[in-house]
Amino acid sequence: MKHPVDTSQWGEFLLNDIATLTNGNKFDKNKMSHDKPSINFVSRTGFNNGISDFVDKIDGTEPYPAGAITLALGGSVGSTFVQPKPFYTGQKVGVIEFDNKSEKMKQFVAVVLNKVCSTQFSAFKNEINKHFKRDLSIPLPLKSSADLSNYDSTDIDWDYMETVMS
């Protein structure tokens, strides 16, 4: 490992306080057309970056942008990926969008989120979809100047995440 991860100065953040969260398109893959496929279709699978098909662009429906993070809310619960290309989603796929964050920063968040989800949530018991937009929190590194007893999202150390993932 190039950069050992120091977790001594981390804080807990509600995901909906630091990113824009949506429940995806909720499209039915079996009803998608495949005449001129040009858009990735992300479902609840934990394989292939969550991409389970390649479908036609839908008139009037813009795909989510490349760089958005997808989170399986069912199926392979908690599978988290940064999407490399524009995409649509199936049912029970959350989409997380950050403003002005690098690919590496988003990859860091995706790894942390995947770990949190794999330890705290499961299908049919404590389902993540009940928490996704309401109270899902993740630990993130804080700047060295942050007060551990009183911090906010401006104290998140995004540069540290970039360094660790480089």
For each feature predicted by the language model, list its residue ranges.
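Non-catalytic DNA-recognition/assembly elements of restriction-modification systems
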Residues: 1-26, 33-49, 145-166
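An amphipathic, hydrophobic-aromatic interaction surface with interspersed Lys/Arg
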Residues: 135-147
